[in-house]
């Protein structure tokens, strides 16, 4: 059975809001999460959300890094935020306080691709190596047309070990 994020083509489980997302299905049947026509449109929404986070953090002179992003994306009122952060850092190889680039600038986007890939693993329970990185790239191109395409990024070899992946995928609260 597919997870909710996969069924909805919304791999980072973006909730309904005032935003009218490009690529949203005409008929929305999920009571909480936006449903998109394609996975690329779901990732487009993720990229646009990250861009809005960058602007918010920049305006408030806060760092834009995996820790601040996930703390806002998956607040402790709804999630085990610290476990989410630890898993994303371990999967992506990013440092928790490592500054990340503004998404729309098209510079060093591979770091953000790794972040989104790891967040997809947490949100959907898909092994990191099986996440559709082409859909992430297509979503980037939909979000920021004309910017540099993403370079393919392979996870560190130790993250592909089946025992490590099994340990990391014990996320029942994030799976349907």
Model-assigned labels for residue ranges:
Residues 1-176:
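Cell-wall polysaccharide-cleaving catalytic domain and substrate-binding groove, primarily
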């Amino acid at each position: 059975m597919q997870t909710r994020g996969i069924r909805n083509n919304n791999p980072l489980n973006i909730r309904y809001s005032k935003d009218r997302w490009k690529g949203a299905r005409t008929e929305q049947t999920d009571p909480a999460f936006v449903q998109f026509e394609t996975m690329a449109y779901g990732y487009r929404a993720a990229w646009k959300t990250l861009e809005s986070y960058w602007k918010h953090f920049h305006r408030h002179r806060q760092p834009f890094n995996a820790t601040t992003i996930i703390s806002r994306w998956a607040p402790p009122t709804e999630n085990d935020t610290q476990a989410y952060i630890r898993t994303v850092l371990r999967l992506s190889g990013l440092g928790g306080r490592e500054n990340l680039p503004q998404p729309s600038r098209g510079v060093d986007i591979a770091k953000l691709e790794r972040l989104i890939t790891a967040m997809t693993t947490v949100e959907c329970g898909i092994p990191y190596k099986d996440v559709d990185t082409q859909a992430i790239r297509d979503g980037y191109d939909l979000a920021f047309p004309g910017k540099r395409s993403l370079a393919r990024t392979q996870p560190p070899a130790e993250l592909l070990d089946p025992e490590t992946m099994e340990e990391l995928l014990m996320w029942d609260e994030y799976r349907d």
